[in-house]
């Protein structure tokens, strides 16, 4: 399991971002998206599974924790969206647990049926492997990337005494989903409602639509979660919940304003990307995201901001 690094210690040494209220456990391995295992009264589930290069380690972490809980199978997997850093390890999950059922949005299901999407995932997954595990030459698998059951907004899936509710949360992508776990009141958000970074900065990776992100923000706020678990981070303090939502909205407005200013200056796409990188990229971030992926996202964030300006 990856070690905590400076960029994650934003709430001080006394706060444990993985101290969940019930039988929820971090089984993350390596860099990239988090993987959270949920032990229900009847079924087990995982929220995302991380990158492919560390897929074998994720499986080991899952098996070890299942054994501690007296279980031996993973029943369900829920995907927040179709990006390689959140579900690249899925082929390893399927091989280790052949009966696992994969859930995601309808659009996520459709994307994973596209050959060009898998080509990109393989490319980015290989770049991540070369960066984080340079001695490895293990092939990055993509053939088993698929959603078995498509969920729509409001759908419920039972784990026994517990339920997981799907909440459509577009903005980051059109395939993004958040998931609410009851009765513990945990909201596992998507990147459509942001990520905490160093210095309590809120990253707003809105690749598709800032308007959709605001809709997702409204829905997630209205859910009224006791606990908020952010992608690429973990839990935030309960007394920070409302401030987090406020900071996320402000962060979105700040990014759109920055792009508006660049547009007024007459900057072209390359110049905008360079300025965006200068403002938001820090080399320490490469411990979690390769620069190639950052730049791909940055281009799309700028395009989404330009669309938001056109819609005003």
PLM feature segments, named:
Residues 8-67, 178-191:
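Conserved beta-strand hairpin/beta-sheet module of binuclear metal-dependent hydrolase folds
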Residues 239-256:
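Short, electropositive alpha-helical surface patch
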Residues 28-31, 151, 170-173:
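A short catalytic or substrate-binding loop motif that flags glycine-/basic-rich loops and adjacent residues
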Residues 49-53, 163-170, 174-242:
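Metallo-beta-lactamase
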Residues 258-312:
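C-terminal regulatory/interaction regions
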Residues 54-57, 149, 208-212, 251, ...:
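Soluble or luminal CAZymes and related metallo-dependent hydrolases
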Residues 53-56, 64-152:
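Active-site HxH/HxHxD metal-binding segment of metal-dependent hydrolases
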């Amino acid at each position: 399991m990856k070690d905590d690094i400076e960029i994650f210690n934003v709430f001080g040494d006394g706060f444990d971002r993985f101290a969940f209220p019930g039988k929820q456990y971090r089984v993350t391995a390596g860099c990239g998206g988090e993987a959270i295992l949920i032990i229900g009264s009847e079924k087990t589930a995982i929220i995302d599974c991380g990158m492919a290069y560390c897929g074998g380690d994720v499986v080991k972490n899952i098996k070890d924790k299942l054994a501690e809980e007296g279980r031996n199978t993973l029943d369900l997997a829920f995907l927040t969206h179709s990006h390689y850093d959140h579900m690249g390890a899925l082929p390893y999950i399927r091989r280790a647990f052949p009966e696992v059922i994969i859930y995601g949005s309808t659009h996520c299901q459709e994307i994973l049926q596209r050959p060009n999407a898998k080509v990109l995932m393989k490319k980015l997954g290989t770049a991540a492997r070369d960066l984080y595990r340079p001695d490895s030459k293990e092939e990055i698998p993509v053939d088993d990337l698929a959603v078995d059951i498509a969920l729509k907004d409001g759908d419920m899936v039972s784990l026994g005494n517990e339920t997981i509710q799907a909440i459509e949360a577009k903005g980051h992508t059109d395939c993004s989903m958040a998931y609410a776990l009851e009765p513990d009141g945990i909201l596992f958000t998507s990147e459509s409602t942001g990520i905490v970074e160093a210095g309590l900065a809120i990253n707003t990776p809105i690749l598709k639509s800032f308007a959709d992100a605001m809709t997702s923000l409204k829905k997630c706020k209205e859910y009224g979660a006791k606990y908020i678990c952010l992608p690429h981070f973990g839990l935030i303090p309960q007394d920070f919940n409302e401030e987090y939502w406020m900071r996320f909205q402000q962060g979105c407005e700040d990014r759109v304003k920055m792009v508006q200013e660049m547009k007024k200056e007459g900057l072209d796409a390359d110049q905008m990307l360079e300025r965006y990188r200068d403002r938001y990229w820090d080399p320490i971030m490469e411990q979690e995201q390769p620069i190639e992926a950052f730049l791909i996202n940055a281009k799309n964030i700028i395009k989404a901001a330009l669309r938001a300006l056109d819609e005003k």
